[in-house]
């Protein structure tokens, strides 16, 4: 039996004719985050000018006058903010348009494929389950492409850029900041695997519920003829309760993730502030560099609190991808 491909690879393969758009949107997401990380560095450089004056970082490049240095910083700030805004606009346009296009194409491709299947196949399926895939699952993929893909790319960019800056400025302090990162990332993947099973159960339960509701509404005349309202109400209540319980199981695990991450972040941030402060007091670290480290540590660590939500969206999308593309791959 051939090994099953990962849902993300299957999705990218299905969107291969949009490869240029995916690459361009990814590049805009990365560059937007790159410029977004510049303000803490500019703040540190401004503090460096105030403290060091003619001996500041900018003074070493031929600008000894502090007033001139501030004008240069203001000019750089304006350019960076304009670039950040432009790339944010571009990634928003590209990812959202791609999400809408992919949603449309997947829905049409899936419907056209279903339409060509044999009648015997339809007798083995529920209308509600098929509607759930064509509507709910396709919409879930649209939500991931609209925001989740950008979030994952920007998180990876943040870790790479901020980690590099911190190791350049103060390797000892940087180590304290990055210690929790592997723990958080490994924990996230463990979380991803566990939550994935629960979200698959959620998708199955909503399919069953939709199927029951659809069949009952279509057969409402029969239900009334046999005065079976109470029995059918109980069946709907049971299916809805099963769906709610499946969601509760997923929510219980999902809700515990962010508080655990915050504790790991607390260790890194306080250790950075303390050790970096001692080094600055002892003259081992410039005040401007210390300011950059304190500010940029937050930019590295706080986005990790959203890692659970991002993986949550990702895992829901992968569960939906499996259901949609399994349907598309059904042999005619």
What are these regions (language model features)?
Residues 6-7, 15, 47, 91, ...:
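Juxtamembrane loop-to-helix connectors within ABC transporter transmembrane domains
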Residues 9-12, 20-45, 73, 77, ...:
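Alpha-helical segments in transporter systems
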Residues 31-35, 39, 75-99, 161, ...:
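Hydrophobic alpha-helical membrane-associated segments
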Residues 228, 252, 269, 300-327:
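Cytosolic ends of transmembrane helices, especially the final helix of ABC transmembrane type-1 domains
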Residues 125-128, 201-249:
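Loop segments that connect adjacent transmembrane helices in multi-pass transporters
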Residues 21-31, 150-201, 272-285, 302:
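Transmembrane helices of ABC transporter permease
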Residues 22-87, 167-172, 283-287:
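Transmembrane helix-loop-helix hairpins at lipid-water interfaces of multipass membrane proteins
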């Amino acid at each position: 039996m051939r090994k099953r491909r990962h849902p993300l690879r299957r999705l990218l393969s299905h969107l291969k004719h949009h490869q240029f758009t995916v690459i361009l949107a990814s590049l805009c997401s990365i560059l937007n985050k790159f410029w977004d990380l510049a303000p803490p560095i500019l703040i540190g450089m401004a503090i460096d000018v105030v403290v060091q004056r003619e001996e500041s970082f900018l003074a070493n490049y031929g600008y000894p006058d502090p007033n001139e240095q501030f004008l240069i910083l203001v000019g750089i700030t304006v350019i960076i903010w304009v670039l950040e805004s432009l790339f944010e606009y571009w990634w928003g346009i590209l990812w959202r348009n791609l999400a809408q296009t992919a949603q449309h194409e997947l829905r049409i491709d899936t419907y056209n494929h279903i339409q060509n299947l044999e009648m015997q196949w339809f007798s083995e399926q529920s209308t509600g389950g098929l509607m759930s895939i064509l509507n709910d699952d396709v919409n879930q993929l649209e939500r991931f492409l609209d925001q989740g893909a950008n979030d994952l790319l920007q998180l990876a960019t943040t870790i790479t850029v901020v980690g590099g800056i911190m190791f350049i400025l103060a390797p000892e302090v940087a180590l304290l900041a990055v210690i929790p990162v592997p723990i958080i990332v490994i924990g996230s993947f463990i979380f991803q695997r566990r939550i994935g099973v629960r979200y698959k159960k959620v998708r199955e339960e909503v399919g069953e519920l939709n199927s029951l509701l659809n069949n009952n509404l279509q057969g409402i005349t029969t239900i009334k003829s046999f005065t079976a309202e109470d029995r059918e109400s109980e069946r709907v209540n049971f299916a809805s309760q099963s769906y709610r319980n499946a969601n509760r199981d997923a929510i219980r695990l999902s809700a515990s993730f962010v508080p655990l991450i915050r504790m790991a972040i607390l260790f890194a941030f306080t250790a950075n502030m303390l050790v970096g402060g001692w080094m600055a007091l002892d003259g081992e670290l410039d005040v401007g560099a210390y300011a950059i480290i304190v500010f940029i540590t937050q930019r590295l660590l706080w986005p990790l609190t959203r890692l659970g939500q991002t993986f949550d969206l990702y895992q829901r999308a992968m569960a939906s991808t499996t259901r949609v593309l399994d349907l598309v791959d059904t042999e005619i």
